[in-house]
A protein has these predicted regions:
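Intrinsic disorder/low-complexity polar-acidic segments
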Residues: 90-239
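Feature for intrinsically disordered/low-complexity regulatory segments and propeptides
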Residues: 1-91, 100
Length: 239
């Protein structure tokens, strides 16, 4: 299992890969960004090549360069507008200051191509009579590479690596919003979308609670799976 973690910080339990800087759960978004090693920006630079000794600029393309080490993160189009890490983490300010969330994890994946921030929501719900606690988080994924949009969503998954980020982003699109890089990051538009998504998150909680209270006999489960994944005669003969 590849974690693809470049740098990160976390509050709470140590991630499965053991990487990152452990922090208190009362950091501001800006403090979390700095401890996680994300206090850098990205800039678009012209791409040139030498042809018969003459320097020629490649039209329509820009190199996306990280300010901290001049690393080229990707090649993007002229119209591609980056979202700076500082702007991404500033988005968490309103929620953290209101007291409903605390910064929980943040980091850089794939050598800086993807940056994420995760805030833990104070509210949680329990299943199976309180035996299983399900936490809720607000995730912001900020890719610095072509072909991926900025994604902000609610998720029950604690993001600590590329795998858990992928699992979160594969969740229901209705729990958040995805923005392309053709325009500036619109924080107000995202907040409005999250207001609607929070209602759907409540529905998710109710459905999970309902299913957790259902009990089935083993024979019923076999019958159910046999209907969903029927075993053919040929396959049955080889089992």
């Amino acid at each position: 299992m590849a974690h693809m973690v470049e740098t990160m910080a976390y509050a709470g339990e140590v991630p499965w890969h053991g990487l990152g800087v452990k922090v208190a759960d009362d950091l501001t978004p800006q403090e979390m960004m700095k401890v996680a090693g994300l206090d850098w920006s990205v800039e678009r630079h012209p791409i040139t090549t030498l042809v018969d000794g003459e320097e020629i600029t490649i039209e329509g393309k820009k190199a996306l360069v990280r300010s901290s080490d001049n690393k080229v993160l990707d090649v993007v189009g002229d119209q591609w507008i980056p979202v700076q890490n500082a702007d991404a983490f500033e988005f968490f300010d309103e929620y953290v200051k209101a007291g409903g969330m605390t910064m929980h994890t943040a980091g850089s994946l794939k050598d800086g191509q993807i940056v994420w921030g995760l805030a833990k929501i104070d509210e949680y719900f329990s299943l199976f009579g309180g035996k299983d606690q399900v936490d809720s988080y607000l995730l912001l994924s900020n890719p610095h590479n072509y072909g991926r949009g900025v994604d902000v969503r609610f998720t029950p998954i604690r993001v600590v690596c590329n795998n858990t980020l992928s699992m979160s982003l594969e969740g229901k699109a209705s729990l958040g919003i995805s923005l392309n890089h053709k325009s500036e990051f619109n924080a107000e538009r995202v907040r409005l979308a999250l207001d609607e998504a929070s209602k759907k998150m409540e529905t998710y909680h109710e459905m999970a609670d309902f299913l957790s209270k259902k009990y089935y006999k083993q024979a019923d489960l076999f019958e159910y799976f046999n209907q969903v994944f029927p075993v053919t005669t040929n396959r049955a003969g080889t089992m």
